[in-house]
Amino acid sequence: MRPGFVGLGFGQWPVYVVRWPKLHLTPRQRKRVLHRRRLLTDRPISLSQIPIRTGGPMNDPWPRPTQGPAKTIETDYLVIGAGAMGMAFTDTLITESGARVVMIDRACQPGGHWTTAYPFVRLHQPSAYYGVNSRALGNNTIDLVGWNQGLNELAPVGEICAYFDAVLQQQLLPTGRVDYFPMSEYLGDGRFRTLAGTEYVVTVNRRIVDATYLRAVVPSMRPAPYSVAPGVDCVAPNELPKLGTRDRYVVVGAGKTGMDVCLWLLRNDVCPDKLTWIMPRDSWLIDRATLQPGPTFVRQFRESYGATLEAIGAATSTDDLFDRLETAGTLLRIDPSVRPSMYRCATVSHLELEQLRRIRDIVRMGHVQRIEPTTIVLDGGSVPATPTALYIDCTADGAPQRPAKPVFDADHLTLQAVRGCQQVFSAAFIAHVEFAYEDDAVKNELCTPIPHPDCDLDWMRLMHSDLGNFQRWLNDPDLTDWLSSARLNLLADLLPPLSHKPRVRERVVSMFQKRLGTAGDQLAKLLDAATATTEQR
C-alpha cells in the first residue's frame, strides 16, 4: 500500500483515511466509508478494533509498474507458493535429486497461512511429523504441563515460521539450486512480477508446480462472511490478545479455530459463563493420544489403528460404525447427547475436551446471517445479544473441499493431499514419486488425491481412500522402504523396521495389506448403503 495511507477494509475495497475521495465508490460504499471515518473522529477507539487491510500482492489495489523489459531465467521446476506444502515438496525434490527450482510467493517469508495466523495458534497434531522431511521440527519432547501434557509437543506459530525460514536459508538456498522470489505475483504461463515491478519469464524444463491449489484460509485474510451492524465489535482471532476485558465473548464457528479461541479464553481465566459458542454443526474429533509417533507410543498407536480396522470390520451401518469408533476411542465429541454431522480432522486432547465442555451457552441454529446490536440472526432463527459483546469470527475455511484433479498433468503438477489431512507428508511423497517413477500414469495411480473432509460420511470416504492408497504403496518394496524412513509419515510405526530381514518384512507387509483390503471392502459396502439411503430421502 502507498506510504501515508491506511486501508479500512470492507469487502475487497480499501478506503483511504487521507485523500479518500480518489476512489470511485458506490453510494452504499461511500456511506460505509463515512461511518468508519466517524469512528475515528467521534468515538475514541483503538485502531486494533478496526479491520486493517494492508497492501501487498494479495490485495494491492494499485497495479505495479513494470520496470523495463522482462528478464528470462531457466529452471527445472517453477514452484508457485512457499507455504507448508510448497516447502515440503521442494525440500524432498532438492534432497533426492539434482533438480533446480524457482520458488515464488506472495508473502514476505515462507510459511503460507502461518505467516498471517493468530498469535496463539499451535499445531493440532504433533510437531514430530510436520514441516519438511529432511529437518525435524521441535525438540522431540513430551509436554509436561498444560492441556497437552503427556503428549508430543505442538509447535506454536512463531516456531513454525522460524522453522520454515531456517529450512529456506540454511538448507535450500545454500545448495545453489533454489532461487526464491518473495513478494511476487504469478501472472500465468511461467511469468511473475516482483514487488519492484520487475517481470520475469521462466523457461521451465520439467514442470510448473501449483502449491496453492488447496487454498488454506485463516480469518485475517478476509472480512467476516456475514453482515455486522455499525457499532458491533467483530474481530479476527489475531486481534483478541490486543483487546481488553469484555462482559461477553461470542465465538462464531466450531472448527479448529473456534476451539482454539475458546481454549485461549479459558486458559486466560475467562469464566465459561461469559462465553457464547455459535456452533452450526457438532463435529467428530480425533483423540490426539491415538496419533502419537515414536517408541514411547508405538504400542498404543498400533493398538489404536488396529481397533479402528476392527470397528470398520464389525460395523453393520454408518451409525453403528461411529458408535464403535467412539467406543474404541478413535473419535470424540463435545456433547455426548448431540450426534455430530461434521468431520474436519480436528484433533483434541482429553484435557482440552474437558475444558470445551465447560462452555454451556452453545447456539445450534445454523450459520450466522447477520449480527445486530441486540440480536444474532442465524439460519434457524435469532437469539438475543449483548450490545457490548465481542464477536470473534472463526468461520474461515482452513481446509476447503477442492475438487480432485490429476496430480501429474503433462508439464504441470498440482499438489494435493494423497493421505487424508496430511498435507505436508503428501507434498513430500509426491516429490519422491516424481523422481522415482517415469510414467505419469503410474505416478497418478500412486498419488490419488483425497479431498479434505467436511461431513461425517467424509470420514468413511477419506479412510476408504487412505486404505486404497496405502495398499498400492505397499505393493512396491522400494516405496515401502521410503515410507518406513520418512519423518513426515505418521504411519511409519505400523511398518516393520528396515533392519528386519527382507523376507520377514515382506511377510509382515503382506499380512498388513490383507487387513487393509478387508477394511477397505467393508467401508465400500457401508458407503454404498449410506449413499442409497441418502438418495431415497
Curated annotation (Swiss-Prot):
GO cellular component entries: cytosol; peptidoglycan-based cell wall; plasma membrane
An example Gene Ontology molecular-function term: flavin adenine dinucleotide binding
Species of origin: Mycobacterium tuberculosis (strain ATCC 25618 / H37Rv)
Protein name, as recorded: Uncharacterized protein Rv2000
Coiled coil: none
Gene3D superfamilies to which the protein is assigned, alphabetical: FAD/NAD(P)-binding domain
InterPro entries: FAD/NAD-bd_sf
